[in-house]
Regions:
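Accessory, non-ATPase domains that flank or precede helicase/AAA+ motor cores in DNA-metabolism machines
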Residues: 1-419, 426, 432-452, 487, ...
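Short amphipathic alpha-helix segments
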Residues: 726-760
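Short proline/glycine- and acidic-rich turn/helix-capping motifs at secondary-structure junctions
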Residues: 750-754, 758-771, 808-817
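Short conserved micro-motifs at the rims of enzyme active sites and ligand-binding pockets
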Residues: 729, 771, 789-791
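Inter-lobe coupling/hinge segments of SF2-like helicase ATPases
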Residues: 251-265, 269, 279-728, 732, ...
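Surface-exposed amphipathic alpha-helical segments in non-transmembrane regions
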Residues: 693-694, 700-701, 738-739, 744, ...
Length: 817
């Protein structure tokens, strides 16, 4: 239960000190208000577009020393209480941005200081930039910089009273027992067995009371007795949860190699030049899988730390394994803080505080780690920069690469992007040489260290397999490859990017495919639980498909409701039937990795096995380094190729190239077998021939002709509502305003030699209904370099809001479904 405090009463003694002004009753008869010492620009913690801009408040003299940029404050807004964040402080009201016409006599006072500063002035400026760039409210952007658990919130109780609700997550303290100088000379009586045990346990250093009690079955009385004698002392120290993540993975060592390859040396030299130039330049490390990009990161971080600065490393969530973290902690020890979604709330808070206190100087984490309070940031690294997970899926829909580039510019530090399959945007900016004032440089790393070589890639044409009578999910080449792995006692990785048992059920008589009652998506069948599950909203229904006697089609009543297609669970069953019992079959997907540390346990199981097959979805394609893996198989490469999305080919190529790179990373050669019905597709050919240009040349030509990024900026404006008509009418109004605005400005664009922004739609989304909400969207194609966000923001302010209709603006959109 979160701690609560009445706003207009006195705080309880045990609560954090909070200064309050008057109670409501006192305010009616209060003397003249307290003199104003300064003025604050306050962003209300109310995420609505109408209240996005800061408001001016006076800082009473009694708060003058406590009110700082980043402080959470209590203010009155209209007839309610609200929490807000100070983003600027000035001595004269006219100095506040946008508030030079206000009457000082009408300025309200800040009622209370609710927290110490949670972010600094630079973070406030970056949040302002994000708010404008991504057409998001400023409070949403500021929340990114808050500690896990957030800041105090103002909530209205059932009795109508406003109260402060403090974050429920709190720090914890450990009690450490240590010998005093006199204690080292103390000799316990011969009969004092417990005292001797305690003294012996403390000879090598301090130990927590918890560990002592676990080791010796309650030492509390002995500790108290020796503490009274001055033999030991007990100290309370802040416990840093989330620092004890250990792994037995053999490849988690961060030990530096004897020598760097020529490619690694070249990349490191370019990063060092960018660091010394201090212009916020970008270095793209374009290295094949297994080329040693992580070692380049580690070496670059060493130089930054030696210069007294800090470093932030972003890794895709699915790649943020114990193996990845282990390499950084092996090299940099306790100075590494880690952030990912599998940490508990308490662990996230402690890792954040480690960074804020300066105890951690290297942060390794997923997208949100970018907003940690690192002091004197000297290097930002984004590994696997092509990954779509760097794009936030909810407002503010920022891209970590773009925010990192802005941070690098402001902190005058290099931004390093690493990938074996760089995004089209990153490659285009490197071809241009500059983007948004920063220099973009591409460095190639074409070879693997040591004796490792790129794997051979074979294409298994499933059309030919079918014509030869095969009906198995495994082609002859893939079955033979698995047999060789078993004979040699090696390891294999199998990719199939569809979890569940079967992608859908279908009635063989009427063709009905059961869909979600709340979404316009087909339901996925899960064999273990005999349920149909919606992977959009999470709803599920019990079902017994054919040949179960109770199988019934929901439309026609036929019992022939059959499983269609393949999911990872079905492939797992087939592998168990095909391979010997002593081969470990390990499935890794969203269903098998739900528990805490599930990722780590599955990978440790795979690492420890003598012979094993790791089967999984895209999470097995990234960040895994197992030298014993000699075979990678792709069960069906065609799923992602023909989706209605201009990035479908790029995503498919990235996934196939990345998973292929898991093979042959040690001394033994690797082999990749890709099963497909489309062997002539440029994506398949590019992976098979280790020639990226086969795909990228084809892809760029298509994007140039159709005007898609990187040749334009793409904005997706999405609305949703329980009422289909309300959603359609609202987005139609937005489209009309945008078209009218740009039609009127067309002569100005043409005089400047620029294309006029285009509006496509509105239209219903591919997934037209989700969670009982109808969804419509429109696309804006804007010239690169034109700040289209300002035009969109102006139109949204003009159209206003409609009750029951929600809106989201996705600048540089990735998800068009």
């Amino acid at each position: 239960m979160a701690e609560q405090l009445s706003l207009f009463g006195s705080p309880e003694p045990e609560q954090a000190p909070v200064k309050h002004a008057r109670t409501v009753e006192q305010a009616k008869h209060a003397p003249a208000p307290e003199p104003i010492a300064a003025y604050a620009s306050v962003v209300l913690d109310i995420p609505t577009r109408a209240l996005s801009e800061p408001f001016a408040y006076g800082i009473p003299q009694s708060f003058d020393n406590e009110a700082q940029i980043g402080s959470t404050v209590l203010v009155h807004f209209g007839n309610r209480a609200a929490a807000g964040y100070i983003v600027d402080i000035v001595s004269e009201l006219g100095e506040l941005q946008g508030n030079n016409t206000l009457d000082p006599a009408r300025i309200k006072l800040i009622e209370a200081i609710l927290s110490k500063p949670l972010f600094g002035a630079e973070a406030a400026r970056i949040a302002r930039w994000m708010s404008r760039e991504y057409v998001a409210t400023l409070s949403e952007c500021l929340r990114l910089f808050l500690p896990p658990g957030g800041s105090p919130r103002v909530v209205k109780g059932d009795d109508g009273a406003w109260t402060v609700e403090r974050p429920a997550v709190k720090p914890i303290q450990n009690r450490w027992v240590m010998l005093t100088p006199e204690g080292f000379d103390y000799t316990p009586p011969k009969t004092a067995v417990r005292q001797r045990q305690l003294i012996e346990a403390l000879q090598c250093g301090p130990v927590t009371t918890r560990d002592l009690n676990l080791l010796y079955n309650s030492m509390s009385a002995t500790i108290k007795a020796l503490e009274k004698r001055g033999v030991v002392v007990v100290e309370e120290r802040r416990a840093w949860r989330g620092c004890s993540e250990q792994t037995t993975l053999s490849s988690a060592s961060g030990k530096a190699p004897v020598a760097l390859t020529k490619g690694q040396q070249k990349a490191l030299a370019q990063i060092e030049r960018a660091r010394l130039d201090a212009h916020g330049d970008v270095v793209l490390v374009d290295g094949v899988t297994g080329s040693g990009k992580t070692e380049v990161y580690l070496s670059a971080i060493e130089r930054v730390l030696a210069a007294g600065r800090s470093a932030c490393v972003l890794v895709p969530e699915i790649s943020l394994t114990a193996q990845t973290v282990g390499r950084f902690r092996s090299r940099f020890g306790e100075t590494v803080a880690v952030f990912h979604s599998r940490l508990s709330a308490g662990e996230r808070l402690d890792q954040w505080d480690m960074v804020a206190s300066g105890a951690a100087r290297v942060v390794v984490g997923a997208r949100s780690a970018l907003f940690c309070p690192l002091s004197d940031l000297g290097l930002i690294i984004i590994d696997e920069e092509h990954e779509t997970s760097y794009k936030q899926g909810s407002s503010p829909r920022y891209h970590a690469r773009e925010v990192a580039a802005e941070m690098a510019r402001r902190y005058r530090c290099p931004l390093v992007l690493g990938s074996a399959t760089p995004s089209a945007e990153a490659l285009d900016r490197c071809r241009r040489g500059t983007y948004n004032g920063a220099t973009w440089t591409r460095v190639e790393m074409p070879e693997r260290p040591g004796h490792a070589v790129l794997p051979t890639v074979r294409i298994a044409d499933l059309r030919r397999e079918f014509s030869h009578g095969s009906r198995s999910m495994f082609s002859k080449p893939l079955m033979e490859g698995l047999e060789r792995v078993v004979e040699r006692r090696e390891k294999a990785v199998l990719l199939h990017n569809r979890r569940g048992f079967a992608p859908f059920l279908m009635c063989r008589e009427c063709g009905c495919v059961p869909t979600c009652n709340h979404c316009s998506t087909a339901l996925t069948y899960h064999e273990r639980t005999h349920t149909l599950q919606c992977h959009t909203c999470g709803s599920s229904w019990r079902v017994q498909p054919y040949p179960a006697p109770t199988s019934r089609c929901p439309k026609c009543g036929s019992r022939y409701l059959a499983k269609m297609g393949l999911g990872t669970q079905q492939i797992e069953d087939a592998l168990h039937q095909m391979l010997p019992d002593d081969v470990a079959i390990i499935r890794m997907d969203a269903d098998s990795t739900r528990g805490k540390d599930a990722h780590k346990k599955l990978l440790e199981q795979f690492d420890a096995a003598d012979c094993a097959v790791l089967l999984g979805t895209q999470m097995i394609a990234k960040g895994l380094d197992f030298p014993e893996v000699t075979l990678v198989g792709v069960v069906n490469a065609d799923f992602a190729l023909k989706l209605p999305d201009f990035r479908a080919g790029e995503r498919a190529y990235d996934l196939l190239e990345q998973v292929a790179g898991r093979a042959g990373r040690g001394d033994r050669p690797g082999e990749v077998i890709i099963q497909t019905y489309l062997p002539e597709d440029p994506v398949i050919r590019a992976v098979a021939e280790h020639d990226r240009s086969i795909f990228t040349d084809h892809d760029l030509d298509q994007r140039r002709d159709a005007l898609y990024p990187p040749f334009v900026r793409l904005v997706n404006i999405l609305v949703w509502s329980a009422s289909r008509d309300d959603a359609r009418d609202y987005i139609g109004h937005i489209a009309k305003l945008l078209k009218r605005r740009w039609h009127a400005a067309a002569p100005d664009f043409l005089r400047a030699g620029s294309a006029v922004p285009q509006v496509l739609g509105p239209a219903s989304c591919v997934i037209e209904r989700a969670k009982d909400r109808y969804r419509f969207h429109l696309l804006v194609k804007s010239p690169v370099g034109y700040h289209v966000s300002d035009d969109i923001d102006a139109c949204l302010k003009e159209v206003g809001s409609v009750r029951g209709v929600s809106l989201s603006v996705d600048v540089d959109a990735y998800d068009l479904m």
